[in-house]
Amino acid sequence: MAGSLPTAVLGRTNLEVTKLGFGAMEIRGGPRGRDITSAQAENILNAVLDSGINYIDTSIDYGQSEEFIGQFISSRRDEYFLASKCGCAVGAPVAPPGTRSPHVFTKENIVAGVEQSLRRMKTDYLDVVQFHSSPSKQMLEEHGAVEALADLQQQGKVRHLGMSGTLPNLPEQIDMGVFDVLQIPYSAMERPHETLISQAAKVGIGNVIRGGVAKGEPGQSGVPRPDPWKTFESAGLDELMDDGESPTDFLLRFTLSHPGMHTTIVGTLNPDH
């Protein structure tokens, strides 16, 4: 399935994933993302699979992303592992740019969200479903959220439970012992979770890295820093680049070098990338 691209086993899931995955947030469209046509979405999704990439990550609150996946590559479902998220309030209006979507971790909302994702993406199962927005252990237990996802797993609709985790809740999420996959932000410009990635890998958790190229080459829009170039240079990262290497290439190389990572998801609308 993985073609000639480098692969890794995603922890105890035993899924052999390409070390480069596709972050389908890039095809969400407006108002929270760049406008996109159906033709663009079809082109990039098929280019991703044609290149050999076999891990696609999306979410129920990524605009048109799930619908595009169902419309354009559901017929190629045996070529990729599909990960989505749960916890976003089903039926809530799209949150304006710069704000977060509401999250509800009740059993009813978890089930409704997964069922919606299955319909949208025209598939009978999801390889990974991750809790969105890094909820605390207390919040998950209060609403029976993990049990809801485990029930869906027993029904064959979800293969592996995951968490899109960040500090301060990431350590307890690792210790809970129920998550097969963690999605964690990490790059040369964002390293607070570095040791936790190693800790998760040691206990058999599969690590999916997001933000591995810091949401784009420094200097491009979307990097959450006032002056990304200044941040990149002040950290001395430009001095570590190989001859002819772009900042994006360096950031990706750095992320891929972490021994505890298994795949890093990167988004683009340009098939040449």
Where are the regions that the model predicts?
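N-terminal binding-site loop/beta-alpha segment at the start of enzyme catalytic domains
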Residues: 1-84
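Conserved, mostly hydrophobic/aromatic
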Residues: 10, 22, 48, 56, ...
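Non-cysteine beta-strand/loop elements that form the S-adenosyl-L-methionine
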Residues: 19, 23, 81-86, 128-129, ...
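Beta/alpha (TIM)-barrel catalytic core signal, keyed to glycine-rich beta->alpha loops juxtaposed to Asp/Glu
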Residues: 4-7, 133-273
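Active-site groove signature of glycoside hydrolases
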Residues: 116-137
